[in-house]
Amino acid sequence: MSMFCFQCQEAARNKGCTVRGVCGKTGDVANLQDLLVYLLKGISIYAEKAKELGVVDRETGAFITRALFTTITNVNFDNKRFEEIIKEAFEVRDRIKNKFLKAYREKNGEEFDEKLPGMATWYSNDVSDFYAKGEEVGVLSTGDEDVRALRELLTYGLKGIAAYAEHAYILEEEDQEIYSFLQEGLVATTDNTLSADELTALVMKCGEVAVKTMALLDQANTSNYGHPEPTQVNLGVRNRPGILVSGHDLKDLEELLEQTEGKGVDVYTHGEMLPANAYPAFKKYDHFVGNYGNAWWQQKEEFEKFNGPILMTTNCLVPPKDSYRDRVYTTNVVGFSGVKHIRDRKPGEQKDFSPVIEHALKCDPPEELENGMIPVGFAHNAVMSVADKVVEAVKQGKIKRFVVMAGCDGRHRSRDYYTNVARNLPEDAVILTAGCAKYRYNKLNLGDIDGIPRILDAGQCNDSYSLVVIAQKLAEVFGVDDINELPISYDIAWYEQKAVAVLLALLYLGVKGIRLGPSLPAFLSPNVVKVLVDKFDIKPIGEVEEDVKAIMAGE
């Protein structure tokens, strides 16, 4: 079965994956994901119509959010799980459809008889039809490449928002306006009457809602676990069995730490879970050791050497090797065929991590990969607490430039660019980072400026919000109206759809001159790229030395 997917930075030949995803997903899974997104658009059509009649269904919004998250790169590779979610999508669509029809009947005194597009009506109880239909309704079903580019840019931004909204929801923070925009955006991708300008306006609104969603998640994280504090994180290991926690879900980490306390098992973070070491709430656990390994794409070698079980709370999962597959556990929206899955928590209860803990007790301690310490925890609250010191260093010329190098890491050798930029920036430049892009340079010894580390790590990719807050506060302190007048440059690395949401957030806030790499998105047509270049001065990365000179010159 053929497929077409170009949603991530590693799309084959920077055009698209057509046989199997570079990420490892099969054509079957890709087509099921396309069908699921198609059905979410149908659900959204009814949700939007119901909203016009004053009917708002929170459960529908929550389902769309969670389902969109499953389609993000490196989240779920399990076709059986997608079959079940698609069946659930039919049920959700019927429920919101019936609520709408009832409200319409009550208001108008007649039945609704408007013809709706296929995503609002198509149904089959034959699973084999799911695969054929998915192949039919993929991204190439939109013929005009510019319309397709704008629709997919919007869709991928929506996926990123959905991921952040789902994390907030798990921590009991939600916002109906976010759910409503996800529905509005999905419906817009089905509307053939929308002009390119109207779609572009929705893309910018997507950036606005991305800021709102990251702020909501920041509130959820900090209200539950405290504000991150500057913290030195241990990179070594202890001589006890361990559990490695990867992904982004702090609630899972919290419950695992509680359930492992006093059990003789250590807990380590991996990848995007590294920033958890900076939250005050987790520092009380003596068996919370530190961080093991690097960015997601190196996990095959690192998971093999960890020896104990690995808990994947969200992306990024790489198809596991046979040598350690039996030690991988997925939870939440993550899935892989044949890998053990920890079920969602019941209301008022914790997840049951006992299978993971029992497994760990039978395993050898981790093999040490490295040792030493790295600093984390420089989110907006921590940086603003020393704002006077930062401002003084800028005024005295000790800090000439802040360089935002947030985003994602990936496999491409071209990403060495970011390591070399960090190495070549002069000693009066400070790097602001968030997301796993940090692993390209966070272990370099770049020193500090008057006690301010030259790499300030704000946290996970969603903590790019902290970088926005820091920039806005600096603008306030320096009395500038335009954020682009600050001594801040942006050299962003992207990989998946959450990075698209972060990029759109920056564009909405008016940031110009962003360098985006290691390649421009395959899903953008030449005309859409031209619009982004003309309006926002987005540029591809170049040679390291030339880029560093330009960055320091504010270009």
Swiss-Prot record:
Binds 1 [4Fe-4S] cluster. The modification Cysteine persulfide is found at residue 408. Hybrid [4Fe-2O-2S] cluster binds at residues 248, 272, 316, 408, 436, 461, 496, 498. Its EC number is 1.7.99.1. It catalyses: A + NH4(+) + H2O = hydroxylamine + AH2 + H(+). It is found in: Cytoplasm. GO terms for cellular component: cytoplasm. It holds the Pfam family Prismane. It is an enzyme of class 1 (oxidoreductase). InterPro entries: HCP/CODH (IPR004137), Hydroxylam_reduct (IPR010048), Prismane-like_a/b-sand (IPR016099), Prismane-like_sf (IPR011254), Prismane_a-bundle (IPR016100). Signal peptide: none annotated. One of its GO terms (biological process) is response to hydrogen peroxide. GO terms for molecular function: 4 iron, 4 sulfur cluster binding; hydroxylamine reductase activity; metal ion binding; peroxidase activity. Its cofactor is [4Fe-4S] cluster; hybrid [4Fe-2O-2S] cluster. Keywords: 4Fe-4S, Cytoplasm, Iron, Iron-sulfur, Metal-binding, Oxidoreductase. [4Fe-4S] cluster binds at residues 5, 8, 17, 23. HAMAP family: Hydroxylam_reduct. Belongs to the HCP family. Catalyzes the reduction of hydroxylamine to form NH(3) and H(2)O. This is Hydroxylamine reductase. It comes from Halothermothrix orenii (strain H 168 / OCM 544 / DSM 9562). The lineage of its organism: Bacteria, Bacillati, Bacillota, Clostridia, Halanaerobiales. The gene is hcp.
